[in-house]
Amino acid sequence: MITIYSEKHRLRNAKTELFGGQLVSPFENPSRADIVLERVQSENLGDVIAPREFGMEPVLALHDAGFVEFLRMAWDEWSKTGYEGEAIPTCWPARRMSQRIPNFIEGKVGYYSLSSETSINKGTWEAAVASKDVVLAGAELLLSGNENGVFSLCRPPGHHAAFDMFGGYCFLNNAAIAAQWFRDNGIDRVSILDVDFHHGNGTQDIFYEREDVLYLSLHGDPRDAFPHFSGYPEETGQNAGEGATFNWPMPPGTQFKKWCDCLKESLAKIDQFGAGVIVVSLGVDTFEKDPISFFKLKSEDFLSIGKLIAELQRPTLFVMEGGYDINELGINVVNVLQAFDG
């Protein structure tokens, strides 16, 4: 399996995350991609190639233009104020407040953000653009017809990024951008299977009223897990998209058997949908030792995940999302990919 990777991910090297009432070193950091890449290479998974540049048209096909411009200029505007730290959201347009976009950068950061754990540093925009190129290079390669599966080692991740909102370590929605690219290049039906521990609120938001992209997510119950306000089973799509969104929230302590039963249900729905391509939002923070999650999957379980997805015999793009146990992160990711490859 070919892996797409860009060194530009290192530009996203934030020093600040608000977690448990404290400012901590971010869980989402450059070492994550390094660890996964090292495992890909040590296991001889396949060639590792750099992406070409795809421009901004695929981004603007899904994301609000004002939001994209905000991300592009956020660090410059923030640093010009004289602030010495990273841009952290502190004020939001809460219930019954105006939804106007402020002029001052502090207000803009709040307006366009989901949550306060994700700061913006100097290289965030450049890294997010490169991550988008990584996923599109993977999509392009998969559509060439020479590969059954491709791995886009995206960093920063993307599935929490909505139409006009960043957060959850995400800025541009890589999986959604790839899905739209497939649609624009002749694939009538695309399925996005999100196996990250956290619900992909951003991906759901982007496709919630569409019938041509099926979104399925297996995740921690939002009553107990981030992002808390998205991912309930009654969220099934709206208007033309009614019935094209499926959520399987699961409680703390969920073991692989329960999780796998939900995976099998989701794969059956993908098969019934008749997807021409599957995009897998590959988060491995379902692992039992993950520091910010509460499922109990073991490393060997990720082999089963790859095998089950492969049984659908559909072209599949794996897109890196979460996973924060650095000791076994690479093992868990590559287990999925190797098992899929057979």
Name what the model sees in each region.
Residues 1-193, 198-342:
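HDAC/HDAC-like amidohydrolase catalytic core signature
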